[in-house]
């Protein structure tokens, strides 16, 4: 059975206000094949239960921490933020071609 996505509606409003993007934009990018990486959160000590999506959206790469709720079969998205280093790492060849 496939997992669905969930997120805080309040957090989504804040992100839409501050970043002009929301969780639905991230979910659409993932479902459209723009998931670049899925791994454990790099800071396992501080965030032992979190995972991290690396997602391409428009001209940037966003980091999306999430937790897995196996009981509800949900991936709960915590937040998302653009990451300059990830953008350079994953999109460097595309930028050189332009």
How should each PLM-predicted stretch be described?
Residues 1-98:
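Ribonuclease/tRNase effector modules and their secretory precursors
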């Amino acid at each position: 059975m496939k997992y669905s996505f969930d997120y805080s509606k309040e957090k989504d409003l804040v992100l839409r206000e501050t970043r002009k993007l929301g969780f639905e934009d991230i979910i659409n990018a993932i479902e459209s094949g723009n998931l670049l990486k899925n791994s454990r959160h790099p800071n396992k000590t501080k965030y032992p239960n979190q995972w991290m999506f690396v997602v391409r959206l428009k001209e940037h790469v966003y980091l999306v921490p999430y937790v897995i709720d196996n009981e509800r079969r949900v991936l709960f998205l915590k937040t998302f933020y653009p990451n300059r280093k990830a953008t350079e790492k994953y999109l460097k060849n595309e930028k050189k071609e332009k």
